[in-house]
Amino acid sequence: MSADEPMGFREITPPALAPMFGEHPPQSLDKDERYTPAWVFQGLGLVFDLDPASPGEGNGDCVPARRKLTKADDGLAQPWHGLVWLNPPFSNATAWSNRFIEHANGVFLGPIANGRWTHQMMKTADLLWLCRDFAFTHPTHSGKRSSMPLFFAAYGERAAGGLRRLAESARHEGVLVRQEQAAVDQYRRAEHELAEAG
């Protein structure tokens, strides 16, 4: 470990990664009310342009975003712009995650699932796994923990910088994975060729 690496973290680059979990996200809409704790945003040190899955002001929301879309706004159907924060509803993680991958500019917090989108993020985004779970916030049941392992994914230089800051400031041990651009480009070309051959 070099002197530049945060204590308790190790940085690796693919292909040292492999699919890790075969669990599926919970399907109950009741499970969707998980609000990210403030220390995550303090660690990231970013102001986002958009939170497309916001619980709304006064509902335990502490996301530093200039624009927030709630369930009533249907963030999946709206245009996304700039740096995006996404903690998606776990009951529909696939649709939200695919949209985030397509947008490719921002920070994602979600469950590790045995889905194509998880594998795609593992190959194309900078990643951070916190080895211990953490409590989400909620106005009526704060402290609720995820039954799923979670990870952060970042697309874009600003988002990746925020993820590195979070790794340095997190109170938990974890693993930070930084993608090499050449490997990302190669993966995207192969995906495009497969889609065209389809």
Predicted regions and their residues:
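Class I S-adenosyl-L-methionine-dependent methyltransferase catalytic core
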Residues: 2-198
